[in-house]
Amino acid sequence: MEAFTTHTGRAVPLRRSNVDTDQIIPAHWLKKVTRDGFEDGLFEAWRKDESFILNRPERTGATVLVAGPDFGTGSSREHAVWALQNYGFKAVISSRFADIFRGNSLKNGLLTVVLEQKIVDALWELTEKDPQAEVTVDLEAREVRAEGITAAFELDENARWRLLNGLDDISITLQNEGDIATYEAKRPSHKPRTLQV
């Protein structure tokens, strides 16, 4: 997983609330188990509308999604996180996220930032007025900055540490590989064990 410290990029203002994971990535995309190749499925139904925000040329290459409240509701699917990442998003800002979606995001390296709705509104206004406006998401300082906007955000220490160091569940486990091997070597052969393939 790539470490996240500070990211600056252009934003997409997604003025929609209660965006569920099926809207983020429809169920027929869930047949794959790899983490790549989901960018075309991101908001697939909405992207059929030529006027949808992601279809606008000035939004190409944007890396920060500024979404409405209750983003990521619905069923738990890591594919929704992967689709956002595959498309190029590094952070999603909203006034409220579904808990499971937020947990999946943070475990997969996608920073979800909770800000007051009035700050989200200000970011929408700024990025609608100027599609080239940049938004900085600073995890070290726990701050979002844009022209005329500075807003602090909270994130639990464990999630912050994992993101700052680029650690997912597997890489954290692998930090203890030596101790695990020592334990397994001492374990009686008649008991279940992990085998190296």
Curated annotation (Swiss-Prot):
E.C. numbers: 4.2.1.33
Gene Ontology cellular component terms for the protein in this record: 3-isopropylmalate dehydratase complex
Pfam families assigned: Aconitase_C
GO molecular function: 3-isopropylmalate dehydratase activity
Residues forming coiled coils: none
Superkingdom to which the source organism belongs: Bacteria
Signal sequence, renumbered to the chain: none
CDD domains linked: IPMI_Swivel
Pathway membership, UniProt: Amino-acid biosynthesis; L-leucine biosynthesis; L-leucine from 3-methyl-2-oxobutanoate: step 2/4
Annotated keywords: Amino-acid biosynthesis, Branched-chain amino acid biosynthesis, Leucine biosynthesis, Lyase
UniProt-listed Gene3D superfamilies: Aconitase, domain 4
UniProt record, GO biological process: L-leucine biosynthetic process
Catalysed transformations (reactions): (2R,3S)-3-isopropylmalate = (2S)-2-isopropylmalate
Transmembrane portions of the chain: none
InterPro entries in the record: 3-IsopropMal_deHydase_ssu, Aconitase/3IPM_dehydase_swvl, AconitaseA/IPMdHydase_ssu_swvl, IPMI_Swivel, LeuD
Stated role: Catalyzes the isomerization between 2-isopropylmalate and 3-isopropylmalate, via the formation of 2-isopropylmaleate.
SUBUNIT field: Heterodimer of LeuC and LeuD.
Family per similarity comment: Belongs to the LeuD family. LeuD type 1 subfamily.
Protein name per UniProt: 3-isopropylmalate dehydratase small subunit
Gene name of the encoded protein: leuD
